């Protein structure tokens, strides 16, 4: 088993797509995933197979699947293997597997995993010793906080964090603690969860006032929200720390059923802020959560033709689609300005429009629009045609259309359609193995390099292209 292939799979979403693995599990195809994990050395299938087997209590079979992956020494597989061994009751073997070696002493993931497995084995103090027995950094501090939650060791953790936090407060520039400013937030979190909320709030407020640590205002606002201190939170949200406090304040009001106050506060900020974009986005989200879709659109529609970052058109479309209002989202694509269309129609707007039409029962109209355009002007043209055929109820035509097509998008849609037809083995067969996917990726980037060399950009910037997904697929996936 090749570790480089495993690393590539994880870093490039290679192998069998996770969405397909989940669908196969939902259809009871665990044995098929076991077969593919072993035959193709497919990491996502191995994870899915282990998840399915463990859900059925078949821990020894799960170890049989994950064991060869763990034997490579690749850290994600080592951790997955140790978790399975713990569930098998083979505690000592799990600890031996996950114990960091000499060459891994600086590998944070290895020490985090070791500490978590120690806690899983009931060895909480040993986990604390393992983390604090090596040079501390901010990730290790947060690992210490995470692995000890609910383990009855808060006082010990506070004894460890207290001196570090005090040094940071006294002189954050000293070399010993310059890289440990998160000790302030970590100490506050542990004080809060141990019930010492007034002490936590006092320290957090002082740190925010003195601007100690990164994101002190946000930490203070979040703590006030978690403690239900709405009056104090309002003071923050209407003062110099408003940028950090508004979202926690609005969400706290909403949780209390005081949505009218939340809306009023946001509308006031939209009217008065020099740069209201963040508040407009929060207002859009708030109104969407309340099911007030038309009001949400009206609140931000003045941004829909902006050519800069403050444009909330796509955000509104995605939120509406998530609520099943594809029809209303589709309406937002109409009436856009010529300047906006010139900059955005070919890039993403029409792809999103076709997706929304497909979801709204207008797949045939979308396909007609698509086919009227020159073929070289539409990215992922053939997979999009196939998807629209399927949305129009012509699934077999869509499958036949996809079979000869190259490319990740084509075989992903094909596999999804086959799963929907209950043709599970065919769906797996439609997915190229890892070596084929790697070769496809190399060819893609080679073509891109040749294209850039042949037609250099007028601006000197390299054009960006994405080999994997068309813009319209983002929300649906």
Language model features with spans:
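Alpha-helical segment of the N-proximal tetratricopeptide repeat
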Residues: 6-36, 42-56, 80, 84-86, ...
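C-terminal non-catalytic interaction modules
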Residues: 395-396, 402-404, 411, 415-477
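Structural register within alpha-helical repeat arrays
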Residues: 19-20, 46-49, 80-81, 113-114, ...
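Solenoid-like repeat scaffolds
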Residues: 5-11, 34-42, 66-74, 99-106, ...
């Amino acid at each position: 088993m090749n570790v480089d292939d495993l690393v590539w799979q994880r870093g490039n979403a290679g192998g069998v797509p996770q969405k397909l693995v989940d669908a196969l599990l939902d259809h009871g195809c665990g044995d098929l995933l076991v077969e593919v994990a072993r035959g193709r050395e497919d990491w996502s299938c191995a994870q899915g197979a282990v998840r399915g087997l463990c859900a059925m209590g078949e821990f020894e079979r799960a170890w049989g699947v994950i064991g060869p992956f763990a034997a490579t020494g690749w850290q994600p597989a080592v951790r997955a293997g140790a978790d399975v061994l713990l569930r098998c009751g083979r505690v000592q073997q799990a600890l031996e597997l996950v114990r960091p070696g000499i060459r891994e002493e600086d590998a944070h993931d290895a020490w985090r995993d070791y500490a978590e497995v120690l806690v899983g084995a009931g060895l909480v103090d040993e986990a604390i010793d393992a983390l604090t027995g090596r040079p501390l950094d901010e990730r290790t501090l947060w690992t210490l906080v995470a692995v000890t939650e609910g383990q009855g060791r808060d006082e010990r953790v506070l004894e460890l964090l207290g001196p570090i936090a005090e040094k940071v407060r006294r002189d954050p520039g000293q070399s010993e603690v310059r890289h440990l400013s998160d000790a302030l937030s970590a100490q506050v979190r542990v004080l809060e969860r141990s019930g010492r909320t007034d002490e936590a709030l006092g320290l957090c407020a002082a740190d925010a006032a003195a601007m100690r640590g990164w994101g002190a205002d946000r930490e203070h606002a979040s703590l006030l929200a978690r403690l239900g201190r709405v009056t104090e939170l309002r003071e923050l949200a209407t003062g110099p720390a408003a940028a950090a406090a508004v979202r926690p304040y609005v969400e706290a009001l909403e949780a209390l059923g005081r949505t009218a106050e939340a809306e009023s506060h946001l509308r006031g900020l939209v009217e008065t802020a020099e740069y209201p974009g963040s508040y407009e986005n929060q207002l859009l989200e708030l109104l969407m959560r309340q099911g007030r879709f038309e009001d949400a659109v009206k609140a931000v529609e003045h941004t829909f033709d902006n050519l800069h970052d403050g444009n909330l058109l796509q955000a509104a479309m995605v939120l509406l689609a998530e609520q099943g209002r594809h029809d209303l989202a589709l309406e937002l694509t109409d009436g856009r300005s010529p300047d906006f269309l010139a900059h955005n129609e070919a890039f993403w707007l029409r792809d999103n429009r076709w997706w929304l039409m497909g979801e709204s029962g207008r797949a045939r109209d979308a396909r007609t629009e698509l086919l009227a355009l020159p073929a070289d002007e539409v990215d992922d043209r053939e997979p999009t045609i196939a998807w629209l055929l399927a949305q129009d109820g012509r699934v077999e035509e869509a499958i036949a259309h996809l079979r000869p097509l190259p490319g990740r998008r084509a075989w992903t849609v094909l596999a999804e359609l086959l799963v929907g037809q209950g043709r599970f083995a065919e769906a797996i067969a439609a997915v190229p193995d890892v070596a084929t996917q790697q070769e496809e990726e190399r060819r893609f980037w080679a073509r891109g390099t040749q294209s850039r060399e042949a037609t250099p950009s007028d601006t000197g910037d390299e054009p960006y292209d994405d080999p994997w997904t068309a813009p319209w697929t983002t929300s649906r996936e």
